[in-house]
Each structure stands twice: as structure tokens, then as C-alpha cells.
Curated annotation (Swiss-Prot):
This is Holliday junction branch migration complex subunit RuvA. It comes from the Bacteria. One of its GO terms (molecular function) is four-way junction helicase activity. It comes from Cereibacter sphaeroides (strain ATCC 17023 / DSM 158 / JCM 6121 / CCUG 31486 / LMG 2827 / NBRC 12203 / NCIMB 8253 / ATH 2.4.1.) (Rhodobacter sphaeroides). Residues 65-143 are annotated as: Domain II. The RuvA-RuvB-RuvC complex processes Holliday junction (HJ) DNA during genetic recombination and DNA repair, while the RuvA-RuvB complex plays an important role in the rescue of blocked DNA replication forks via replication fork reversal (RFR). RuvA specifically binds to HJ cruciform DNA, conferring on it an open structure. The RuvB hexamer acts as an ATP-dependent pump, pulling dsDNA into and through the RuvAB complex. HJ branch migration allows RuvC to scan DNA until it finds its consensus sequence, where it cleaves and resolves the cruciform DNA. InterPro entries: DNA_helicase_Holl-junc_RuvA_I, Hlx-hairpin-Hlx_DNA-bd_motif, NA-bd_OB-fold, RuvA, RuvA_2-like, RuvA_C, RuvA_C_sf. Pfam families: HHH_5, RuvA_C, RuvA_N. Its main location: cytoplasm.
Length: 224
């Protein structure tokens, strides 16, 4: 299993990149969102990867964060959602947006992804809604890849010919996991807590953990 590829960006296609790792080129399929965040050709890049195996084809799919990779895996468990459809959803919404849409039952947002029809979008929401809280709670430990040191130059090459490897710019740190943990400690059910936190995050994208908890508690409070 190839879980990470780090090297030099050699080529950019419409839906994939070619990463040179010590002279071996890896074709990695990425979402539109990830492709837009790629550095220039000849610069270093690192992606978490998922190897998708079919009868006559092996394909690598790349992600800037581990949480996005895990969401891709989960999306592919839904009948009718293949690897590229999963990438389309993540490309349109991002990992946090996907989590929020599924948790809130917002099939319309899922349907906004290219190639995703209303039936598939509804199926994604229905099948994954109960699984979303556990994955959302992973958010704190699945940050984007940090810059890494370049590999040692091969014999006969100059050290200056290899640039520092780095990941695409990471998204804003998520406070979702900490808010979910706090609500769980207060005795709220995971599904209820996830829905409240997702709604709070959607209404206040820049909210920190404390603000998310306060907003979620208001949403969870009994209606008079």
C-alpha cells in the first residue's frame, strides 16, 4: 500500500499530477481543490495517497490531509460512488464541507458536485449520516502534511537541484473535534452533537472551539 508520495512536481494534468520521487514518476489523481493548491512545476510536494485497485487498473488518489483521505474512503462505501465521484464531492465541498453537508442531511450541497445526481446525493446523506460523527472527531489528529526535508541527492547530482518538499497550503485548523469531544463529555449523543457542531461551524466558519461549543449548546438546548 502506498500511503504517501513526496517528491518534485513534474507535470500537472486536468485531474492528476506527476510527482517525481528519485527518478520514479507517480501519477496521482487529485480533486480540483487540491490541484488548485499545487505548487509550481519543479517544486516539492507531498500528498497522502490511496491506491484503488481494479481488475485491469491501478490508480493513486492524492489528498492534502489524512481526514480528507478518510472521507474519500467512506464516500466510496456508498453504492454508486466510485473513486472519481468521491473526489468530485471533496473537490466541491472540501472535507469539512462534506462532513457538514452529510451531518445536516444537506443532499443539495452534495449534489452540487459535478456528476452527482439527486439519488446518489440522497444515498450519501442517508448512508453516512450516522458514520459522520466518528470521522469528524478525528479532525484534530489529521492535519495536513508538514514540510519535509528533501531526499539526499543521488550520486552525481548537486544538492541544489532538489528543492524542499512541502504539502499544499493546509486549510484552516478545525476546532470541530475538540467541540465534539466536549459535548460528548457533557453527555450528548454523537449524532446530536455532530449536527449541532456542523450547523454552528456553517454559520460561523471562523469560530474557535469555545465559540463552537457555546453555539452548539444553544442549538441543543430544549426549545421552550
Amino acid at each position: 500500500m502506498i500511503g504517501k508520495v513526496a517528491g518534485i512536481l513534474d507535470f500537472r494534468g486536468p485531474d492528476h499530477v506527476l510527482i517525481d520521487v528519485r527518478g520514479v514518476g507517480y501519477i496521482v489523481y487529485v480533486s480540483d481543490r487540491t490541484l488548485a493548491s499545487m505548487p509550481g512545476l519543479g517544486e516539492g510536494v507531498a500528498l497522502y495517497t490511496e491506491l484503488v485497485v481494479r481488475e485491469d487498473l491501478l490508480q493513486l488518489f492524492g489528498f492534502p490531509t489524512m481526514i480528507e483521505k478518510e472521507w474519500h474512503r467512506l464516500l466510496m462505501t456508498v453504492q454508486g460512488v466510485g473513486a472519481k465521484a468521491g473526489m468530485a464531492i471533496l473537490g466541491a465541498l472540501g472535507a469539512e464541507g462534506t462532513a457538514r453537508a452529510i451531518t445536516l442531511g444537506d443532499a443539495r450541497s452534495i449534489q452540487a458536485a459535478p456528476g452527482i445526481g439527486p439519488k446518489i446525493a440522497q444515498r450519501v446523506v442517508l448512508e453516512l449520516k450516522s458514520k459522520a460523527p466518528a470521522l469528524m472527531a478525528m479532525g484534530g489528529g489529521t492535519a495536513a502534511l508538514a514540510p519535509s526535508e528533501p531526499p539526499e541527492p543521488e550520486p552525481g547530482t548537486s544538492s541544489g537541484s532538489r528543492r524542499k518538499t512541502r504539502a499544499p497550503e493546509p486549510p484552516r485548523p478545525s476546532h470541530t473535534a475538540d467541540a465534539l469531544s466536549a459535548l460528548a463529555n457533557l453527555g450528548y449523543q454523537p449524532t446530536d452533537a455532530a449536527q449541532a457542531v456542523a450547523q454552528a461551524a456553517g454559520e460561523s466558519p471562523d469560530a474557535d472551539t469555545a465559540a463552537l461549543i457555546r453555539a452548539a449548546l444553544k442549538l441543543l438546548a430544549p426549545k421552550s
